[in-house]
Amino acid sequence: MASKAGLGQTPATTDARRTQKFYRGSPGRPWLIGAVVIPLLIAAIGYGAFERPQSVTGPTGVLPTLTPTSTRGASALSLSLLSISRSGNTVTLIGDFPDEAAKAALMTALNGLLAPGVNVIDQIHVDPVVRSLDFSSAEPVFTASVPIPDFGLKVERDTVTLTGTAPSSEHKDAVKRAATSTWPDMKIVNNIEVTGQAPPGPPASGPCADLQSAINAVTGGPIAFGNDGASLIPADYEILNRVADKLKACPDARVTINGYTDNTGSEGINIPLSAQRAKIVADYLVARGVAGDHIATVGLGSVNPIASNATPEGRAKNRRVEIVVN
């Protein structure tokens, strides 16, 4: 019986051990509280370590920022140096251009100065890193400067400086107006001087005693031009034939032919047009035998109107050429 009893107790012990190995009771309340609180404490510690208050360690005030420099503003203050100077029949060019096209624009604008027989000293260099003044519309400036034998133009940063000796304040102002119209964003400094009145020479005699009055009597006043035109009419040729005769009779006489326009359009258009009108009259006089080196021409644009530009009749009178004995 004892043997049976021992055998009967063994399975009970085995079942008990199996029950202890695979069966777990519910976790207690303290364990659950710890499982919730401990992660919260860790998160709070991490926040305190990595999230610094701005009031303690952050910068105060407005933070400086880096902004790109405006290319337009920078170019206005960093134009390359350029010098254009005229001495009689010699024009000297010194400076830098970024490419051949920019240099070609200057040479085209200089057409009014580069007459046959003019010597050009070209010391222009091409440097791709520089910024230069735009001369693509600058021809009126040099056309207006033709009567100034020592004309100079200098470009430095954002300033254009004009120099030379003009025969009159009209010529001085014409160059300034042309430069201002061509480069409205530049500072234009007009240092052109006006020559003083030359001491009177011995009085002329005969038909040359009062040549200006004689020419005025022949022309009957200024020679007029049609709207936007630079062409002479048959009546003008008859008048200029008689003017040429007067000038040839006074071989020492010198004249300036001033061209004008009405106030229609900008001076960038008016000055070249007025210069063209003066030149066509001068060319005809030369063709009739007047010495070319005794004639100077200048385009003055719309300045010095002789009639009101408010009416078509007044504008027609202002489109004119005047022959002035020097």
UniProtKB/Swiss-Prot annotation:
Impact after mutating residue 236 to A: Increases conformational stability of OmpA-like domain. Does not alter peptidoglycan-binding
Disruption phenotype: Significantly impaired growth at pH 5.5, reduced uptake of serine at both pH 7.2 and 5.5. Reduces growth in macrophages and in intravenously infected mice. But the same mutant has very little effect when studied by another group. Upon operon disruption no reduction of serine uptake at pH 6.9, no visible effect on outer membrane permeability, however severe delays in ammonia secretion, medium pH neutralization and growth also occur at pH 5.5.
Main location: secreted
GO MF term list: metal ion binding; peptidoglycan binding; porin activity
Region annotation (Required for protein translocation to the outer membrane) ranges: 1-73
Cofactor: binding details: May bind Zn(2+) via residues in the BON domain.
Listed transmembrane segments: 30-50
Residue stretches making up the OmpA-like domain: 212-326
Region of interest called Disordered, as start-end residue ranges on this chain: 1-21
GO BP annotations listed: ammonium transmembrane transport; monoatomic ion transport; response to acidic pH; response to host pH environment
Compartments, record wording: Secreted, Cell wall; Cell outer membrane
Every BON domain range: 127-196
GO terms for cellular component: cell outer membrane; cytosol; extracellular region; peptidoglycan-based cell wall; plasma membrane
Entry keyword annotation includes Disulfide bond: yes
Classification via InterPro entries: ArfA_BON-like, Bact_OuterMem_StrucFunc, BON_dom, OMP_bac, OmpA-like, OMPA-like_CS, OmpA-like_sf
Lineage: superkingdom: Bacteria
Keyword terms of this UniProt record: Cell outer membrane, Cell wall, Disulfide bond, Ion transport, Membrane, Metal-binding, Secreted, Transmembrane, Transmembrane helix, Transport, Zinc
Cofactors demanded by this protein: Zn(2+)
Keyword set includes Transmembrane helix: yes
Pfam annotation, one family: BON_like
S-S pairs: 208-250
Function, in words: Probably plays a role in ammonia secretion that neutralizes the medium at pH 5.5, although it does not play a direct role in ammonia transport. The OmpA-like domain (196-326) binds M.tuberculosis peptidoglycan. Overexpression in M.bovis or M.smegmatis gives channels with average conductance value of 1,600 +/- 100 pS, but this may not be physiologically relevant.
Similarity field: Belongs to the outer membrane OOP (TC 1.B.6) superfamily. ArfA family.
Name of the protein in its database record: Peptidoglycan-binding protein ArfA
Species of the source: Mycobacterium tuberculosis (strain ATCC 25618 / H37Rv)
Gene transcribed to yield this protein: arfA
